[in-house]
Amino acid sequence: PKSRFVANFIGKSTIFEGRVEAVSGTRSIITSEQAGTNFVLRRNIEAIEDQEIWVGLRPEKIVISKDKPEDYNPNKPVNCIKGIVEDIAYMGGLSTYHVRTANGNIIKSTDFNIERNADHPSWDDEVYLTWESENIMVLYS
């Protein structure tokens, strides 16, 4: 999808307002004060520097973990948001985590319930939400 309307119409996505910081042949950076992170894409986007833009993330593309990523920098996070698990919805083989970020946003992450004894996050746990560059949707309107 290229618009916020379509992204939300075809499924639930978390959408953040951002601004294009840099665009080069193989890398683009979008900063988002609303999200509290930088979105780094390993591709060129159809935008110019300083352009207002939106980014979207699908819940099933967001990885949730209690472990801090090795390259996590709290002063300049990249493709990662820290938060607290506020709610968990169990739906058969899936769990949807509702994570509140420091900016007050609620981000949903969906995870499979494959292992019963796995160390899944629980209510009030501090967690890190990460995603791969190719899973960032760039929305132009």
Please state what every model-predicted region is.
Residues 1-11:
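Conserved beta-strand-loop-alpha-helix hinge in the C-terminal portion
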Residues 13-15, 22-141:
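Non-catalytic connector elements of ABC transporters
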